[in-house]
C-alpha cells in the first residue's frame, strides 16, 4: 500500500510572513533541555501472551511479527536489522532490549523502519530506526498506538509519524535529521493523543501536524535547532481540515534557526520561528519557554494554499469527528488560492525572549488582501 505523502503546495515565499502585520509583546528568561533515556528490557512471558525472541526464536523481526498473536511480545536482541517491518497483528508489543543497540537500518533503500497499517493496539518501544527513505516509525489508520523510548534519525520524511490514527501516545523519544518533521500527528479529530517528553532537533520542523487536534496534547518536550520548532497547520491537501484545538504546554523551544540540514519547502517558509500556528485555530499555547529565534517566538498567522481543493468549513462543522466529514463532496470548481485563518488561539503565560521580529506575533491580512 503506497504511503500517503504530504506536500505543502505553496506559492508564498518567506516574504509572506515578514509582510504580515504583527503585534508583539515579550518577557525574558532562559532555560535548557532534557534528553530521553534508555530503558533495559527483560525477557519472559508477556502480560497476556508469549514472548517471541529475535533472533533466538525468529531470525528477523518481520518473521516474529508475522507469527505473533494478540497479547504477544516480540523481544528484539541487540544488533542491526536491515528490515522494513509491516505490522498487521493487533495488540502486540515490539520491544528492543536496548534502545541504542537495537537498530533498524534502512540503508537509504527501504521505506519505513516499522509501519503499523490499519492495525490497533500496537506498541513499539526501546529501539532505533535510521536511514529509511520515508519514516522511522509509522502508524496509519490505527487506534490505541504507542511509541515509547524510540530514536529515529536521518530518515527521508518523518522520524516518528502517526496519520489518521487515534487514542495514541508518543513519549520519551528522540527525532533528528528528517527534512519534514521529527514528530508528526496528522489528519485526526478528535485525535485523543499525547506527545510527552520528547526531544526533536536538527529537522526541517521539530513538530508538524496538518489538520489534527482535539484532545491532542504536546507537552513537556524540547524542540531545538530545527529550521522551525512547532508548526500545527491546515490545508485541503489532506482531509479533516482545519487543524484546531491543540494544547501546547510546558515545552522548551529554542534556537530553531537551522540552515545546514535537510528541509522541505514548508520548513524554509517557517524557518526561524519557535511556535508557529500556521492557519491553525482554537489552540491553547501556555507555559512554554521559547527563546532565541531569528523571526518570532510564538506567532499565529494565516496559511496560504495555492490550488486548494476546498475552503475552510463553516463553524458548525468544527466539532464534527473526522469520519463524519472526510467523505463530503468537494466543490465542483476548485477555489484556487485559499488563506486559512489562524484565529481563536489562546497564547498566555509563556516566557519568550530573544526574537528577531517579535516575541509574540499575530499575522493579519489587510482588507481586500
Locate the predicted segments by residue.
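Short, T/G/N/S-enriched strand-turn elements that build extracellular solenoid repeat scaffolds
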Residues: 61-68, 81-89, 104-105, 138, ...
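Right-handed parallel beta-helix
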Residues: 97-101, 120-131, 143-158, 166-181, ...
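Glycine-rich beta-solenoid repeat tracts in large extracellular/virion proteins
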Residues: 65, 84-88, 112-118, 135-141, ...
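Bacterial N-terminal signal peptides that target proteins for export
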Residues: 3-14
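Bacterial signal peptide processing site
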Residues: 28-30
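C-terminal motif of bacterial Sec signal peptides marking the signal peptidase cleavage site
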Residues: 22-26
Amino acid at each position: 500500500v503506497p504511503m500517503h505523502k504530504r506536500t505543502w503546495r505553496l506559492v508564498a515565499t518567506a516574504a509572506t510572513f515578514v509582510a504580515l502585520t504583527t503585534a508583539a509583546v515579550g518577557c525574558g528568561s532562559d532555560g535548557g533541555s532534557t534528553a530521553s533515556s534508555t530503558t533495559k528490557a527483560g525477557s519472559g512471558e508477556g502480560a497476556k501472551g508469549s514472548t517471541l525472541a529475535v533472533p533466538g526464536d525468529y531470525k528477523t523481526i518481520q518473521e516474529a511479527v508475522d507469527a505473533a498473536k494478540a497479547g504477544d511480545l516480540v523481544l528484539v536482541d541487540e544488533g542491526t536489522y536491515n528490515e522494513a517491518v509491516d505490522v498487521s497483528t493487533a495488540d502486540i508489543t515490539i520491544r528492543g532490549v536496548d534502545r541504542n543497540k537495537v537498530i533498524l537500518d534502512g540503508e537509504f533503500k527501504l521505506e519505513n523502519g516499522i509501519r503499523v497499517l490499519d492495525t490497533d493496539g500496537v506498541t513499539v518501544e526501546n529501539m532505533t530506526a535510521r536511514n529509511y527513505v520515508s519514516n522511522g516509525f509509522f502508524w496509519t489508520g490505527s487506534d490505541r498506538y504507542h511509541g515509547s523510548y524510540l530514536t529515529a534519525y536521518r530518515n527521508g520524511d518523518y522520524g516518528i509519524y502517526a496519520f489518521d490514527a487515534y487514542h495514541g501516545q508518543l513519549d520519551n523519544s528522540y527525532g533528528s535529521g528528517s527534512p519534514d518533521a521529527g514528530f508528526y500527528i496528522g489528519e485526526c479529530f478528535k485525535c485523543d493523543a499525547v506527545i510527552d517528553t520528547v526531544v526533536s532537533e536538527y529537522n526541517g520542523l521539530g513538530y508538524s501536524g496538518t489538520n489534527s487536534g482535539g484532545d491532542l496534547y504536546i507537552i513537556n518536550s524540547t524542540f531545538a535547532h530545527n529550521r522551525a520548532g512547532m508548526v500545527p497547520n491546515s490545508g485541503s491537501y489532506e482531509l479533516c481540515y482545519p487543524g484546531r484545538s491543540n494544547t501546547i504546554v510546558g515545552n522548551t523551544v529554542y534556537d530553531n534557526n537551522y540552515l545546514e540540514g535537510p528541509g522541505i519547502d514548508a520548513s524554509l517558509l517557517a524557518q526561524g520561528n519557535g511556535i508557529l500556528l500556521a492557519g491553525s485555530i482554537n489552540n491553547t499555547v501556555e507555559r512554554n519557554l521559547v527563546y532565541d529565534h531569528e523571526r518570532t517566538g510564538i506567532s499565529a498567522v494565516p496559511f496560504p494554499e495555492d490550488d486548494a481543493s476546498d475552503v475552510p468549513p463553516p463553524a458548525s462543522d468544527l466539532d464534527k469527528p473526522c469520519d463524519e466529514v472526510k467523505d463530503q463532496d468537494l466543490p465542483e470548481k476548485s477555489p484556487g488560492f485559499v488563506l486559512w485563518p489562524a484565529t481563536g488561539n489562546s497564547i498566555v503565560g509563556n516566557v519568550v525572549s530573544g526574537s528577531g521580529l517579535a516575541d509574540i506575533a499575530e499575522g493579519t491580512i489587510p482588507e481586500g488582501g
